[in-house]
Amino acid sequence: MTRGFLWAALLAAATVSAAAGDFDAALAKRLGADQYGMKPYVLVILKTGPKTDLPKDVQTKIFQGHMANIKRLAVGGKLIVAGPFFENAQHYEGIFIFNVAKVEEAEPLLRTDPAVAAGALAFEAYGWYGSAALQETVAIHNRIAKASP
């Protein structure tokens, strides 16, 4: 049993050592990662807003602006994840993850969204601690998406 424990300990030590050898200090610094490879963001849950009776042509125009705003914020490095929810009982419409540290920094960005400004969408915003690598999502997505909505 002692021999098995020693082999397991050596294997674990080798695994940890290999993982530590993969650390890229320059990348961690560029992404603003802490010692765990993490950083603060703001997670936003978009919900159905109070204006549910907008005419179809107005809704279409608002959501075209919503998509254009998403693209603008992503290109500017402020929005790193965005996407819709499937239909659900909570009336959650989608999520944003903003590359800002505080809710107070995200709120002005949210107010630039035509769907939020028109009341078609409402939001809840929360401080969130996640992998600094999420900032690479937009660049990777642009390489794998054939079309844009």
State the predicted function of each range.
Residues 1-8:
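Bacterial N-terminal signal peptides that target proteins for export
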Residues 13-17:
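N-terminal signal peptide c-region/cleavage motif recognized by signal peptidases
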Residues 19-149:
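Conserved, structured core segments of small domains
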